[in-house]
Swiss-Prot record:
Its main location: membrane. It is a multi-pass membrane protein. The modification Phosphoserine is found at S166. This is High osmolarity signaling protein SHO1. Glycans are attached at N59. PANTHER family: FCH AND DOUBLE SH3 DOMAINS PROTEIN (PTHR15735), HIGH OSMOLARITY SIGNALING PROTEIN SHO1 (PTHR15735:SF20). Plasma membrane osmosensor that activates the high osmolarity glycerol (HOG) MAPK signaling pathway in response to high osmolarity. Detects changes in external osmolarity and activates PBS2 through the stimulation of STE11 and targets PBS2 to the plasma membrane. PBS2 activation leads to changes in glycerol production that helps to balance the intracellular and external osmotic pressures. Activates also HOG1 in response to heat stress and mediates resistance to oxidative stress. Involved in the regulation of the mating pathway. May be a receptor that feeds into the pseudohyphal growth pathway.
């Protein structure tokens, strides 16, 4: 059996929520922004169509193209309601934004023709199209922005379903993860966690690493499986690995002197790394799934975090775990952009730090 087959655990298919796009009016009622904006749009449309019909029924001249703009606006309002009821707003954001932009041009053009016309009936029609233009501009700002934008997050914070997940932020996350993983295997995320926990943090992935103010643990299991198996490793990386090995050996010797009960643990640390970091037959204690975290005790998960958004683990990365929105997770390491965490069902792995928020007490779990 090759070393890589020992080190790499078999990827597990993450559990994903079933996406239900059936017609549900509660999807529309649960969003205060949708209810308020669409209700105002309907009222404005009624004012515009009423003023237009009254003005056209008299001998006053009425711009004919305004009729198409009013009908087009009605189609936009109906489409928005359907997208919300079927929970398809995020799937058609580009279409919604561009179609509303066209309606904005139609309404502003009609307002230009009606606002300077004489007669109270045309004044009512002009007031309706002006209100529709304002609402369309607000819609363009909202639907044209990503869910991670400040305005969208503030608006979605009033929704019963909470803040919507950002497809852009999620795709950038995974693209960065794949790019880092293809550069040097195990130099990112889990491997950096092992280096950081040993007190020797370096900049491997192009992003500045912070020195931790505390050490949660130095476990032989956490360091298992990260021996250097790359024949073309650069001298700089070898220097870091040698320094890390010396620190681990020093810690092992100190433990042997002070506590004889840890002899087995120190033996595992010595056997995990090859002395010259060659590609020889190096034994590893990596488990079949996430052995990296299998021996971490409950005492090491000293933090609690609340999931701000749902997250689906990457199929290509067996170390990531999925979680639901508002789920409470136990966290053992809060340094860097990826944290070690444990779910309530005992599943352990790494999670993106910007998808969760640390909580101090039980009262914050229900916010």
């Amino acid at each position: 059996m090759s070393i890589s087959s020992k080190i790499r655990p078999t990827p597990r298919k993450p559990s994903r929520m079933a996406t239900d796009h059936s017609f549900k009016m509660k999807n529309f009622y649960a969003d205060p922004f949708a209810i308020s904006s669409i209700s105002l749009a309907i009222v404005s449309w009624v004012i515009a169509i009423g003023g237009s019909i009254s003005s056209a029924s008299t001998n006053e001249s009425f711009p004919r193209f305004t009729w198409w703009g009013i009908v087009y606006q009605f189609l936009i309002i109906c489409s928005l309601m359907l997208f919300y009821c079927f929970d398809l707003v995020d799937h058609y954001r580009i279409f919604i934004t561009t179609s509303i932009a066209v309606a904005f041009v139609y309404n502003t053009n009609s307002a230009t023709n009606l606002v300077y016309a004489d007669g109270p009936k045309k004044a009512a029609a002009s007031a309706g199209v002006i209100l529709l233009s304002i609402i369309n501009l607000i819609w363009i700002l909202y639907y044209g922005g990503d869910n991670a934008s400040p305005t969208n997050r503030w608006i979605d914070s009033f929704s019963i379903k909470g803040i919507r997940p950002s497809p852009l932020e999620n795709s950038l996350h995974r693209a960065r993860r794949r790019g880092n993983r293809n550069t040097t295997p195990y130099q990112n995320n889990v491997y950096n966690d092992a280096i950081r926990d040993s007190g020797y943090a370096t900049q491997f992935d192009g992003y500045p690493q912070q020195q931790p103010s505390h050490k949660n643990y130095v476990s032989s299991t956490a360091l298992a499986g990260f021996e250097n198996t790359q024949p073309n490793t650069s001298e700089a990386v070898n220097l870091h690995l040698n320094t890390l090995q010396q620190r681990i050996n020093s810690a092992s010797n100190a433990k042997e002197t002070n506590d004889n009960s840890n002899n087995q643990t120190n033996t595992n640390i010595g056997n995990t790394f090859d002395t010259d970091f060659s590609n020889g037959n190096t034994e590893t204690t990596m488990g079949d799934t996430l052995g990296l975290y299998s021996d971490i005790g409950d005492d090491n998960f000293i933090y609690k975090a609340k999931a701000l958004y749902p997250y689906d683990a990457d199929d290509d990365d067996a170390y990531e775990i999925s979680f639901e929105q508002n789920e409470i997770l136990q966290v053992s390491d809060i340094e860097g952009r990826w944290w070690k965490a444990r779910r309530a069902n005992g599943e352990t792995g790494i999670i993106p730090s910007n998808y969760v928020q640390l909580i101090d007490g039980p009262e914050e779990m229900h916010r």
